[in-house]
């Protein structure tokens, strides 16, 4: 028995691949990885001991591209699919798991050509174009969101790494706010943090700001101009995000699925600012269920005024009829919403098929 994991491009897809690879390793099952030279795949897995072999194809996505660029991208995808077909055959792969993203294309199609069972994990509440096409052809589609076209869909807990659960805690007071710009940096969140920093620090609230590597120098300059650089924690990125989340009492974040469920597992109340240009507005739908259950606050990017942060802080500090702060209630309920061992459940479901 030997697995192929494929897909990625961004940290959200890749974190799922990592969680599944860790579970395969725990169960003593060998795995290879097939991704792309474009995006973050190599950064995550080029030297990863989780895989016996790693392959990266010259492929790109087709979303938001001109007609001719789409044709070029599809040609590269087709070329890579035939290479992937030979790789899967060489390694005698018995199961393929796709975590989505454009880099999943070649190995997913190659698996179908080789008649290797294909399993898909759809991370978002709205399917990406590749997963929409491949879903009917897959053995099973795992997701933490309920889809109307149930078919071969399996509802599972999101495959969050156990460290997010291990570092969870119940929040009782807002003393520390985390601004999470993400691996690519979110300009709107970076600006929101800078606008609120003077008042927050004056109130004695600590700030940790992860602004993304491309924005680091500019954001650092503005904190310096505000005279706050030595009063806040600023990072381009951080390798130990679980420890950073553990210290925070409130987070401001985009609404990529992995971030949403990692924050949920950590019990960290969050203000989500969905990326307005995400395909099919999927970031908004990723947190819609949470918002309906009063487990988060969602602020559209075009309504992101500094006063919004303090409005949310006031609401979180209010108490219910039993005398419990909304902050504490939300923190507790978030931890109850997601079960540990989502990756284990997915792998065991595949093995029992």
From Swiss-Prot:
Catalytic reactions of this protein: di-trans,octa-cis-undecaprenyl diphospho-N-acetyl-alpha-D-muramoyl-L-alanyl-D-glutamyl-meso-2,6-diaminopimeloyl-D-alanyl-D-alanine + UDP-N-acetyl-alpha-D-glucosamine = di-trans,octa-cis-undecaprenyl diphospho-[N-acetyl-alpha-D-glucosaminyl-(1->4)]-N-acetyl-alpha-D-muramoyl-L-alanyl-D-glutamyl-meso-2,6-diaminopimeloyl-D-alanyl-D-alanine + UDP + H(+)
Annotated GO MF terms: UDP-N-acetyl-D-glucosamine:N-acetylmuramoyl-L-alanyl-D-glutamyl-meso-2,6-diaminopimelyl-D-alanyl-D-alanine-diphosphoundecaprenol 4-beta-N-acetylglucosaminlytransferase activity; undecaprenyldiphospho-muramoylpentapeptide beta-N-acetylglucosaminyltransferase activity
One Pfam family cited in the UniProt record for this chain: Glyco_transf_28
GO biological process: carbohydrate metabolic process; cell division; cell wall organization; lipid glycosylation; peptidoglycan biosynthetic process; regulation of cell shape
Annotated GO CC locations: plasma membrane
Record keywords, A-Z: Cell cycle, Cell division, Cell inner membrane, Cell membrane, Cell shape, Cell wall biogenesis/degradation, Glycosyltransferase, Membrane, Peptidoglycan synthesis, Transferase
Membrane topology according to the record: Peripheral membrane protein
Compartmental location: Cell inner membrane
SUPFAM superfamilies the UniProt entry points to: UDP-Glycosyltransferase/glycogen phosphorylase
Family membership noted in the UniProt record: Belongs to the glycosyltransferase 28 family. MurG subfamily.
Function, as annotated: Cell wall formation. Catalyzes the transfer of a GlcNAc subunit on undecaprenyl-pyrophosphoryl-MurNAc-pentapeptide (lipid intermediate I) to form undecaprenyl-pyrophosphoryl-MurNAc-(pentapeptide)GlcNAc (lipid intermediate II).
Protein name: UDP-N-acetylglucosamine--N-acetylmuramyl-(pentapeptide) pyrophosphoryl-undecaprenol N-acetylglucosamine transferase
Organism, as annotated: Helicobacter pylori (strain ATCC 700392 / 26695)
């Amino acid at each position: 028995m030997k697995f192929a994991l494929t897909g990625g491009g961004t940290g959200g897809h890749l974190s799922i691949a990592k969680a599944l690879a860790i579970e395969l390793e725990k169960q003593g099952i060998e795995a290879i990885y097939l991704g792309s030279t474009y995006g973050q795949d190599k950064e995550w897995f080029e030297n990863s001991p989780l895989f016996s072999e790693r392959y990266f194809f010259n492929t790109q996505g087709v979303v938001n591209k001109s007609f001719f660029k789409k044709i070029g991208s599809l040609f590269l995808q087709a070329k890579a699919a035939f290479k992937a077909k030979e790789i899967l055959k060489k390694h005698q792969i018995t199961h393929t798991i796709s975590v989505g993203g454009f880099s999943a294309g070649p190995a997913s199609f190659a698996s179908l050509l080789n008649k290797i069972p294909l399993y898909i994990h759809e991370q978002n509440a709205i399917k990406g174009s590749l997963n929409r096409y491949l879903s009917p052809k897959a053995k099973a589609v795992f997701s933490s969101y309920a889809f109307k076209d149930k078919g071969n869909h399996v509802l599972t807990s999101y495959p969050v790494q156990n460290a997010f659960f291990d570092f969870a805690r119940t929040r009782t007071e807002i003393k520390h706010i985390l601004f999470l710009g993400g691996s690519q940096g979110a300009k709107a969140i970076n600006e929101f943090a800078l606008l609120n920093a003077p008042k927050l620090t004056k109130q004695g609230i600590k700030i940790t700001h992860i602004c993304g590597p491309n924005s680091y120098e500019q954001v650092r300059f503005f904190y310096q101009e505000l005279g706050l650089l030595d009063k806040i924690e600023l990072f381009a990125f951080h390798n130990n995000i679980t420890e950073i989340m553990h210290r925070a009492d409130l987070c401001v974040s985009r609404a990529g699925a992995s971030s949403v469920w990692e924050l949920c597992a950590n019990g960290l109340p969050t203000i989500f600012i969905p990326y307005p240009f995400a395909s099919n507005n999927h970031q908004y739908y990723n947190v819609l269920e949470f918002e309906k259950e009063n487990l988060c606050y969602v602020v559209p990017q075009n309504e992101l005024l500094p006063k919004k942060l303090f409005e949310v802080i006031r609401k979180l500090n209010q108490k219910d009829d039993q005398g419990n702060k909304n902050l504490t209630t939300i923190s507790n309920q978030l931890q109850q919403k997601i079960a540990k061992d989502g990756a284990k459940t997915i792998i065991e479901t595949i093995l029992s098929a």
